[in-house]
Amino acid sequence: MSATAPFKTLSAKAAFQLDQELMSTGEFSIDQLMELAGLAVAKTIYKEYPPNEATTTTKNKFNPNKVLVLVGPGNNGGDGLVAARHLKLWNYDPIIYYPKRPASNQLYSRLIKQLQDLNVPELTTLTEVKHLLDSRDSKIKIIIDSIFGFSFKPPIREPFKDLINYLGQNHDHLPPIVSVDIPSGWDVDEGPGTEIDIQASCLISLTAPKPCAKLFVNSGPDKIHYLGGRFINPRIAKEYGIEDIVNKYQGDELIVKL
């Protein structure tokens, strides 16, 4: 097991305050932040699991083409929808599962319409998800976990409890799971619970890593950790003590491997 990763983290409370500051004095809209976050997720997928290229992992070689995007009801889910749109344009074949949608929310309705215009298919039941992943000839090569973000508070409720439980129990035969900001079901500050535990292969921390990211990288020797969401100005970075992490970006990078 590797040593604790030397990077600054933001608690759930601090991450919430930072987001609020970005959207008040920072004058960012939620659309902008979601677009930048989703782009970072897509770029992480492209860099770590390139399309139509064999990638060596500890288990096998695979051609990462079809991507299953698991979409939650909040902003984390919106990041996943944005990522799916980019991946479709980059020669991946995303499929989304979006079982619980915000009522009458134009932002999410627009994101769904954009995916429909790109002919991105959608699964409507957990049975379909299980059938797709359990099938011997399943073509799914990557699972994007964009169910819950840093504002998640336990317990996990349906329609996500059975889904997350399935992912945790069947980890050994599932394709790599890439979690957005936190592995869904984990406590943002304390890490995995005792009942349900998604074992992600890759984590993309947005804005700055959360405390559970250190537990993630220390949970196995082959864990992959990226930082994305390059929209923090120097004043906010200093205020929250994350100058070092923000300064890891070089040139025109929108993501950086930690």
Swiss-Prot record:
Disulfide bond positions: none
InterPro entries: YjeF_N_dom, YjeF_N_dom_sf, YJEFN_prot_NAXE-like
Catalytic activity reported: (6R)-NADHX = (6S)-NADHX; (6R)-NADPHX = (6S)-NADPHX
Keywords: Cytoplasm, Isomerase, Metal-binding, Mitochondrion, NAD, NADP, Nucleotide-binding, Potassium
Cofactor(s) needed: K(+)
Every YjeF N-terminal domain range: 15-244
Pfam families: YjeF_N
Keyword Mitochondrion (UniProt): yes
Cellular component terms per the entry's GO annotation: mitochondrion
Cofactor note: Binds 1 potassium ion per subunit.
Gene Ontology molecular function, alphabetical: metal ion binding; NAD(P)HX epimerase activity; nucleotide binding
Residues bound to K(+): N76, D145, S184
Cellular localisation: Cytoplasm; Mitochondrion
EC number in record: 5.1.99.6
Record-listed (6S)-NADPHX binding positions: N75, N76, G77, G78, D79, G149, F150, S151, F152, K153, P154, P155, D181
Purpose: Catalyzes the epimerization of the S- and R-forms of NAD(P)HX, a damaged form of NAD(P)H that is a result of enzymatic or heat-dependent hydration. This is a prerequisite for the S-specific NAD(P)H-hydrate dehydratase to allow the repair of both epimers of NAD(P)HX.
UniProt family annotation: Belongs to the NnrE/AIBP family.
Protein's UniProt name: NAD(P)H-hydrate epimerase
Organism of this sequence: Candida albicans (strain SC5314 / ATCC MYA-2876) (Yeast)
Taxonomic classification: Eukaryota, Fungi, Dikarya, Ascomycota, Saccharomycotina
